């Protein structure tokens, strides 16, 4: 099992200095959705281009219309589950797919298991290109909840994984936690750990005071140095309701504490109703969906980043928050390994008492807050986009080199048709 961990530097070779690969990234989530997968793909796209790669992206359109926007190819899709915001596409003969196959990528990197993955695999087969897949989601937790540990569920997930990842020559996971997912059990020898990366320059310039004050006014909160921020998709598995339930206890310790929730999703109505019913509406504000390029401004409104999710694999929001100098206060979870050191760049909590103690302790000590801020900024440096892209490109080259060594590829046809 290979690992491209954040503590290791990729070995530089003479070949790797001149990267000129043609890479196709395939994803369901891109531009039209604000979530972790979108952030990963955008970061990887930018990083690979900075290394000299030609990059194109295949993604689902937010409507039934297919179109091309620069190097991004969007195929028409249908909304099949509004609650979970799932879209699928059946446009397997879309001319855009033929155009991508004719472009002949050197490698196809798939960031989804949905219908886009099926399209991308067909493109790879036509182009004679190897496939790398990244798994971003704990499917067992997402779909089966408390039944995920049962033998039938594990068997079903192993079968699903055997079919889904069969064509992938390597499977990228963003954290150690992912290795134990049942759907990856059939291909343990193909797993590579590459931690996600972010564009640090997008997050580190602080907001000018006038812009900061304007943002606070726009959401109806005070710029009082007591603001908690959570950037998340509003769905049940993110467990934001737990923080809302803890908030009255926090207000007894820190009466002027307030929470800014950045993001949208199917659970928003329930969360807002809880705030109204419990008298929290003046202390908790929901922004709705914010464009990815604007999210950094909202991180900078906060003094602490909070999360109750146990669904994360390698959360982009944890990295982005630290790049903005925010200490983290997160529910205990294996995904925090290597990201959050308890007492150094934030606090880990297990119950309501620990949550209140962690938040009030940081807000009550300027020295502690500044120490954790410095540690957060330092930790974020380990997850920069440059290192992320270098490690990923090193994997691409090793996959292509292994394939070349095994056998000479068949001559490619002059025309490609689906």
Label every model-predicted segment.
Residues 217, 221-247:
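Conserved donor-binding/catalytic core segment of Leloir-type glycosyltransferases
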Residues 310:
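Aromatic "clamp/platform" in nucleotide-sugar-dependent glycosyltransferases that forms part
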